[in-house]
Amino acid sequence: MDTNNCGVCKTIVNPGSERVKAGTSVFHAKCFVCKECKNELESFIRSKDGSLICDECDIKLNARKCFKCQLPIQSTIVTARGKSFHNDCFNCASCEKIIKGGFFFVEGEFYCSTCDAKPSDKTKTTTPPPSEIPLPGKSGVSLANGVEIQVPNNSTNIIYVLNTNESSNGLSSSGGSGNSISGSGGTNTGSSTSSFMIHKRNNSNELNVVTPTATTTVDLLTSSTTTTPTLSPSTLSPPISTARFSNDYLISLQDDIYAKQQQQLLLLQQQQIQIQQQLQQQQLEILQKNQSLLNSSSPSPSTSSTSSTSSISQSQNLNTSQPNITQQLSNLNISNQKNGEIEKYIPKINGKTLTELLKHQSFDDILGEVLSKKISIYKELSKEEVAFGDVIASGASGKVYKGIYKGRDVAIKVYSSENFCFNIEEFDREVTIMSLIDSDHPNFTRFYGANKQNKKYLFHVSELVKSGSLRDLLLDKEKPLAYFTQLSIASDIANAMKHLHSIGVIHRDLKSLNVLITEDFTAKVIDFGTSRNVDLAKQMTLNLGTSCYMSPELFKGNGYDETCDVYAFGIVLWEIIARKEPYENINSWSIPVLVAKGERPTIPADCPSEYSKLIKACWTDKPKKRPSFKEICDTLKKISESLTLKRNKK
C-alpha cells in the first residue's frame, strides 16, 4: 500500500503500522477515535474542523432538540414559530392531544383549532370585540358610568355587568363587596376602582342578578360611600397583559381615539333609543287618529249594494284595527331589524366593471394593478355598523365571529396583529378578490364590505351560512346523505370553481373545510385566492391539514395552476362519497411522501363506477391529464341525469 498522510494528524502513516482506512482516507489507529468521547469509531461524521465525531456525540452536539422535552430529535421534526418538536411532543396545551391540523399560538402555548374554536370559560374576564355592545334595536341594555338607559320593551335575558378587575365575583343584586347592578343600594366597599370591563352575560342566575324588566331604569355604580368614577381611556378596558386568555380574541381598547369613540357611542345609543320610543309613540298616535276618522266618517252615497259592501269593509277595519296596533308596531320593528335591505355594491376600477376590464386584461393583471396602486374597490364599513357575537371558527390568521349587519346575520372574519399569520397585504388581496367575484353566484357567499380603520385590527363581513362546513356535515354520520344529494354538492363546488377559472382565479386552498353548506344543501366555496404568494413550507406550517389536498407536483417545487385545484377537488370528491378524513390516522408530515409516491385514499367498494372514474381522473399524477372544471361539470350532470332516468323507470 502506498504511503499516505493520516486524515487527522496529517503525519505519514507507515504501511506496517496499525492503521484504519475509511473511504478514501487513511488514519493511524490511535487517531481514529471520537474527538468528544475518545471511543474507537465504527462509523464517523467529520466536523467542520476536520476532527472525527461518533454518531452519538454528533446527535448530542448538532441534532435539533425538542423545545418541550429537550431531547434530540432523530425522526420527524415539527417546526412551528421557530421551535422544533418531536411529533408526539407537539400537542395542545388544553386537550393535550397531538396537533395535526392548524394551531393557535397564545402566550407561549400552542392550542389546536378545536380547542381554540370552543367558547371561552364564562368565569374568565375578557375584553369583548369593540362592537359587542348591542346596537340600537338589539335586545339588552348598554351601560356606562352615570348613564341611565331605559330598557327597550323587547328586552330579553341579556344584561351587561360592569365590575372591577380586583373583584370579578363581587356582583350581587343586594349589595356586598364589589359593585351593584340593581337600582337600589349597591355599596362599594372595595378599594378605589382603576379599571373596568364590560361583559356580556346570559342571565342564568350564575351571578344572582335579576333580569331588568321593560320598565326598569338601570343606574350603574350607585354608591352610598363613593362617587361614580368617570370613563377614560384607562377605564374602558384592562391592560391586555391581565385580560388575555388563550381561548379569547382580544382587541386593544387603550387607544385614546377609540376610547372617545366608544364613549360617544354609548351616549348615541341612549339618544337613539329615546328617538325610537318617540317614533313608536308618534306611530301609535297616527293609527289612533286614523281609527277616529273611520269611526266619525259616514258612507258615501252610492247604490245599495255598493253601500252595503263599503259598510261591511269599514266595519271589519274598525273591528280589527285597534287590537293590531301594537302588533303592527312590533312587526315594523322586527322588519327593520331582521329584513334590512342591503344594496348591492358593484366595484369599479377607473370607472369600469370587472366584466369590461376582462375583455382586455387578465384577472391577475387587474388584481395586480389594484393592489400595487392601493386602489380601494370594496365597500368600507364602520365598526358602528356591525355587532359582534360568538366565535364560530378560528385559524392562524384570525377568527370568524357571528354578527349582525343591517339586521342580517353575517360572518365577520377578524384579523389582528396578535394572530400568528397577520398580514395586511393578504387581507387587501382577500377583500379585493371577494369584491370582484360575483356575489350573486349561487355557489359563493355574498360579500358586504370591510374595515381597515385600525391597522392592527381588520375585519370583513360576508353572508353567514349557519349549517357549517362540508367537512362537518360529512363527518356527522348521524345525518344521512343520499347519493343524489352528494352529486348535487359536488356539482355546486365544480360550478363555483368553473366560474373562478373562467376569470383567471386559482383557488389554491380548495378543501372540504372551505366549502359551506346551506340548510337546503347548497354548497358555497369560500376563501378563494387567499394562499397566493405563500411558499410551500410556510403554507404547510400554517395549515397542516392542507397537505392532504396538495398535488404531487407541488412537493417537487412546481408552481400552482388550475390543475392543482382539480387535484384538490378529487380529494373532496372522495370525502363526499367516503365521509372520512383523507389519510386518516396518518401524521400530516408524512402525507407529502405518500402523495409523491402515488398513494391515494382508498375509494369505497360501493362507490358508483362513474363517480370513481371521475375521482381517479382528478387526482392522477399527470397534471395535463386531469379534466377541466367545465368537463367535470358536464360529467357530474350526466351522472345526475342517468340517476334520474333510473329513478323514473322504477
Curated annotation (Swiss-Prot):
One of its GO terms (molecular function) is protein serine kinase activity. ATP binds at residues 392-400, 413. GO terms for cellular component: cytoplasm. GO terms for biological process: signal transduction. Keywords: ATP-binding, Kinase, LIM domain, Metal-binding, Nucleotide-binding, Repeat, Serine/threonine-protein kinase, Transferase, Zinc. InterPro entries: Kinase-like_dom_sf (IPR011009), Prot_kinase_dom (IPR000719), Ser-Thr/Tyr_kinase_cat_dom (IPR001245), Ser/Thr_kinase_AS (IPR008271), Ser/Thr_Kinases-Pseudokinases (IPR051681), Znf_LIM (IPR001781). It comes from the Eukaryota. SMART domains: LIM (SM00132), S_TKc (SM00220). PROSITE patterns: LIM_DOMAIN_1 (PS00478), LIM_DOMAIN_2 (PS50023), PROTEIN_KINASE_DOM (PS50011), PROTEIN_KINASE_ST (PS00108). Its EC number is 2.7.11.1. Belongs to the protein kinase superfamily. TKL Ser/Thr protein kinase family. This is Probable LIM domain-containing serine/threonine-protein kinase DDB_G0287001. It comes from Dictyostelium discoideum.
